[in-house]
Each structure stands twice: as structure tokens, then as C-alpha cells.
């Protein structure tokens, strides 16, 4: 049976297949936040990508990324979300990062973390998420707030990003998760270079890799 949250999201023009990808808790998180906004939001299509930050792309089969965006006037609300598909054990040094194209200029961040162990049938709230590294074109959430469980379990982090319409037409979002980095946190950073973007992957202030994020390509280039 479709929930009230489904009905609200349908009203925004969000496609049904996108709605059904979302966990019920995530739908509620999004709808509650949209209702706190100023007026009636409409679904906004964005180009979603992901980046393996400390490993190969195939290492990322155990994590799912989602992002939905909604717009009213010059205001955009975006919800970058990750979900573990397998039980894992974050070490207190993980990070979840996202970068936005120049069409979106963020100014406020926050979120909620859920957990679910082997004995649980539904998610429980772990706590609030705070963007402890905020950029002009994105943010990262890192450290013990992403979970430090004694045994492996699933985590789901839903974040909100309130933004205003930017200068360009590049409406991509690139998300990445760094799982159990060896010594220091790994985060995404971006510098705009004319019509392209180069994404630096940083570990403790040292560039450990870079990615060309091209304007007219659907996927990221290694």
C-alpha cells in the first residue's frame, strides 16, 4: 500500500521508480524536510555518480548511493544517501563525501544515521550527522558519527543539503564513501576548471588520486 510519503513525493513529480528505490525512513526524512521548506517543491532531475575512494569500483558492490533533488524558485533541496547492503564494521575513520556541479550552491547541511544489526528487522536511529568538512561545492561527513560498532552491521546515512541555484547548468552530484581507510580519512574535494572539473581524492591532506569529471560524459573518468 503506498504510504502518505509516497503520495507526497508523487505530488512533486518524482518518478515512481525513483520513489520505490528509497527506504520508508528515507522517504519520511525527505518529506519532513520538504514540508519545513517554504512552499511546494517540484522534483528536479540531477545526474548522479559515485566514486570509489579507497579501492576499486568492484569493491563497492556492498554499498548503494541515492540522491534526490527538489526545487522551488531559486531554492534546491538535495538528499545524498548511502546504504550498506552487507554487514560492515566502520572503524571511526570512515567518511561519506559528495560534490555538486556549479548549477547548485549549497549553504546548509545535516543528516541522520540509521543502523540495523543481524537481529533487527527494521532500522533504528543511531544519531544526527554533522558535515564536519563543508565546501563551496559539497561536504563530507566523517569520523565516529558514521558508526563504531563492536560487530559488523548495516548503516544507512541520509543527509540533506539546502542550496541555491548556481551560475552554470552542471547539475551533477558525485558521492563517495571511504571504508576503513588505513590511517587517515579520505575525502572528495573539487576544483572547477573551465568546463571540466578535476576531483582530488585527499587522504590526510595528501592527494592520493584524481578524477576528471567531464561535463558531457555520463560516467567519471579514472
Task: Kindly give the residue locations of the regions a language model identified.
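N-terminal propeptides/leader regions of secreted preproproteins
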Residues: 1-61
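Mature secreted bioactive peptide module from preproproteins
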Residues: 48-218, 222
Amino acid at each position: 500500500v503506498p504510504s502518505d510519503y509516497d503520495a507526497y513525493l508523487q505530488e512533486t513529480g518524482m518518478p515512481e521508480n525513483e520513489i520505490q528505490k528509497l527506504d520508508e525512513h528515507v522517504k519520511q526524512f525527505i518529506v519532513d524536510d520538504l514540508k519545513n521548506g517554504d512552499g511546494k517543491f517540484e522534483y528536479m532531475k540531477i545526474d548522479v555518480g559515485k566514486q570509489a575512494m579507497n579501492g576499486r569500483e568492484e569493491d563497492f558492490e556492498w554499498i548503494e548511493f541515492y540522491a534526490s533533488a527538489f526545487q522551488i524558485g531559486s531554492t534546491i533541496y538535495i538528499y545524498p544517501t548511502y546504504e550498506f547492503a552487507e554487514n560492515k564494521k566502520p572503524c571511526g575513520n570512515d567518511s561519506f563525501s559528495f560534490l555538486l556541479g556549479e548549477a547548485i550552491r549549497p549553504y546548509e547541511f545535516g543528516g541522520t544515521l540509521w543502523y540495523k544489526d543481524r537481529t533487527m528487522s527494521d532500522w533504528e536511529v543511531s544519531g544526527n550527522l554533522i558535515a564536519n568538512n563543508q565546501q563551496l561545492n559539497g561536504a563530507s561527513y566523517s569520523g565516529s558519527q558514521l558508526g563504531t560498532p563492536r560487530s559488523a552491521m548495516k548503516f544507512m546515512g541520509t543527509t540533506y543539503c539546502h542550496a541555491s541555484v548556481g551560475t552554470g547548468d552542471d547539475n551533477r552530484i558525485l558521492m563517495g564513501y571511504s571504508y576503513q581507510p588505513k590511517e587517515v580519512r579520505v575525502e572528495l574535494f573539487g576544483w572547477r576548471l573551465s568546463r571540466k572539473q578535476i576531483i582530488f581524492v585527499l587522504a590526510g591532506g595528501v592527494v592520493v588520486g584524481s578524477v576528471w569529471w567531464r561535463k558531457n560524459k555520463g560516467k567519471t573518468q579514472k
